[in-house]
C-alpha cells in the first residue's frame, strides 16, 4: 500500500484516509453499485497482505434489485463484511440492510454507520485493508427527509484515534 499512500486522487474515490499504527490502512470509496464495489475490492485485494474488509450499505428509494447483488459481491470479494445504513431516505433502514444480507448472510448487520466503522476499525490487524464504501465524499446521511451531518473520512479518523491502533 506504500505506492497508494502517496497518490493524490479525487476525494471519495479510493481516498486513503488512515494508516493505523498496527500496519492496517483504511480507504473511502463512493462505490454504490455492484460493479463499482467489485472493481474497488478487486483493485485493493493485492494491497491487503492480511484481510480485506468492507463496510457498505445500499441507498433507500433506489434500485432494490441491486441490494442482494451488493451483498453477494461483498461476500465473494472481501474477508470481513459489515452491512450498514447509507442514505436510507424514506425507507426503513433495517429492511434495506436485510435485502443486502440476502446476498451475504454471513455479514455483520450494524445499522448505525459510525458504529459500523468503529467495529470494522477495531478488527483491523497488520496488513489489513478496509474499504468504507458507498458515500465517498458526501457530508450527510439522508434519513426521513433530513440530511444529518456525516462524513466517512472524518468518522474513520475518529475511530482510528479512539481505537488507538
Give short role names for the model-derived ranges.
Residues 2-165:
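ATP-dependent carboxylate-amine ligase
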